[in-house]
Structures are given as structure tokens and as C-alpha cells.
Swiss-Prot record:
EC number(s) given by UniProt: 2.1.1.199
InterPro entries recorded: RsmH, SAM-dep_MeTrfase_MraW_recog, SAM-dependent_MTases_sf
Top EC group: transferase
Identification of the protein by name: Ribosomal RNA small subunit methyltransferase H
């Protein structure tokens, strides 16, 4: 296990419990098990329900297994929510009572040494949520064309200096570490732009590359389609997003669906929660019911 000392705190815990868990003798799916924070709450609140918890990250599932060992109603599996129909079929399950997804990067992935998600440490460029997949941040930064890099950084990072950054990336290849990438981004941006940004100047580019590595937005669309098919009548879908690109997809899908009814959201964390868990500050929860 990698060096990792942070304690994970699930985002919007009370709200997830309130809106997702509408019956105790159901089947609930946590599509992003992570360290097991939300899964723990679901299993504890609904002891007569089956809880299927999946994640693509084998390392984080090891932590979840320890955190959830007291529960006999939880099944932990290494799988992507893109493949949820196959996962449930293998368990003999046709319909479920609730589906939860806490999107984006996990605390473990950001803080554990050597995963390459953070611009605050010097690590090999990686950013894979599933460490068994081939495509990594190193592959994208070193082998994508300047045009393709520019499109990704603009589209997924909403970075208006995408062309300048892409040009510098190609010019400074090979790029092997997060620190090298940060310095290249810094070189590409006007000094005045760096000074006026509230967040770290590399945030947008790192987000864009991470989304491309893990096909995050494409996968969210598939998750929503899966949920629409797999939820029983009255079943709940709860999605926590952390940036506008994710939230927009969820919002529009629910709005345009003939089978889902919007029942809550966007629900944002209270001031007290963001004080205790700064990661929660940009979280938005949207909830829909299968009709």
C-alpha cells in the first residue's frame, strides 16, 4: 500500500442518506466505492438491504474492504460503472432500488504518493484511476498532437490559454513528471493571469488531462443510461458532481429523460460541512426518481 495518511470523509452524507435510501429491504449500488464512506452509511442505515459497491481502483478497494469488514450485506467488486449491467447480471440482479455516484477524483487518488494526480508533488505523470489500463497522463502529454491537446485542455479544462499550453507541452517533450508539466504550464501563461487566478494555475490543465485519461465525461453519460435501465420503479439516482462539466451532463440527462423525474438538487454542502471537509465545497448533489 502506498503512503497515505489522510482520513476520508464522505461528501453530503446526510443528504445522500435522506434522498437515496427510500426503503430498507432494497438493493443499492455505490458506483464509486472509494474508501467506503458512503457505502458504510448505506449499509448501516439499511441493514436489511444488499449493497453492491464497485470501483475501478484496486488500491482504494483494499482500504474499503477494511472499513466495511463489519458489514455482511456489502459486496465489494473491482468494476467500472460503465459495466454495471454486466456486474448486476453476474449477481443475478435485474433491478435495483438506488444508485449513487460520487464523481471525479477521490481523496486517496489525490493524496496517495505516486498516483500523479496532484500538482503539489513531484511524481511520475500517471492520473489513471484504474492502474491496470494503458492510457496514462504520460502517454497523452508526450504523444498527442498539439491540436488534440489544445482541444482537450480547452474542452475539459475550460482553459482559455489552451493553445499556448499545448504548444509549450509539445515544445518541451519528453515530459515525465507532474513538476515538469506544472513548469511548462507556468511558462505558457501570462504572469498577470497566474497572479489573478484564485485557484492554482495548473488546475484546469490537470483536470483536462485527467478527464481524458479516464474518459470521465463519456463514462458519466453511460452511467446515466445504465441507471435509467436498471432502477426499479420508485428507485432513486443520486449523483454528486464537482465541476460544471459533470453537473451539466447530469442536469440535462435528467431533464430530457422520459423515465426519470427530478426530485432534488442541486443540493450544496452547508457551511459547517465545508469547514470540516474542504473537499466538499464545490459538490452538488442531484437526485432523480425512476417513474
Amino acid at each position: 500500500m502506498r503512503k497515505y495518511n489522510d482520513k476520508h470523509i464522505p461528501v453530503l452524507p446526510n443528504e445522500v442518506v435522506e434522498y437515496l435510501l427510500w426503503k430498507d429491504n432494497g438493493i443499492y449500488v455505490d458506483c464509486t466505492a472509494g474508501e467506503g464512506g458512503h457505502t458504510f452509511l448505506i449499509a448501516k442505515k439499511c441493514p436489511n438491504s444488499r449493497v453492491i459497491a464497485i470501483d475501478v481502483d484496486l488500491e482504494v478497494l483494499e482500504i474499503a474492504q477494511k472499513n466495511l469488514k463489519a458489514f455482511h450485506n456489502v459486496i465489494l467488486l473491482k468494476a467500472s460503472y460503465v459495466d454495471l449491467p454486466v456486474v448486476l447480471k453476474s449477481l443475478g440482479i435485474e433491478r435495483v432500488s438506488g444508485i449513487l455516484a460520487d464523481l471525479g477524483i477521490s481523496t486517496y487518488q489525490l493524496k496517495a504518493e505516486g498516483r500523479g494526480f496532484s500538482f503539489n508533488r513531484d511524481e511520475p505523470l500517471d492520473m489513471r484511476m484504474d492502474i491496470q489500463q494503458d492510457t496514462s497522463a504520460h502517454k497523452i502529454t508526450n504523444f498527442y498532437s498539439e491540436e488534440k491537446l489544445s482541444k482537450i485542455i480547452f474542452k475539459y479544462g475550460e482553459e482559455r490559454f489552451a493553445r499556448r499550453i499545448a504548444k509549450q507541452i509539445v515544445k518541451n517533450r519528453p515530459i515525465n513528471t507532474t513538476k515538469e508539466l506544472v513548469e511548462i504550464i507556468k511558462k505558457a501563461l501570462p504572469p498577470s493571469e497566474i497572479r489573478k487566478r484564485k485557484r492554482h494555475f495548473a488546475t484546469k490543465t490537470f483536470q483536462a488531462i485527467r478527464i481524458e485519461v479516464n474518459k470521465e465525461l463519456k463514462n458519466i453519460e453511460q452511467l446515466l443510461k445504465n441507471a435509467e435501465e436498471l432502477l426499479e420503479i420508485g428507485g432513486r439516482l443520486a449523483i454528486i458532481s464537482f465541476h460544471s462539466l459533470e453537473d451539466r451532463i447530469v442536469k440535462h440527462f435528467i431533464k430530457n429523460s422520459n423515465n426519470l423525474k427530478h426530485i432534488a438538487g442541486p443540493i450544496k454542502p452547508t457551511q459547517e460541512e465545508t469547514k470540516n471537509n474542504p473537499r466538499a465545497r464545490s459538490a452538488k448533489l442531484r437526485v432523480a426518481e425512476r417513474i
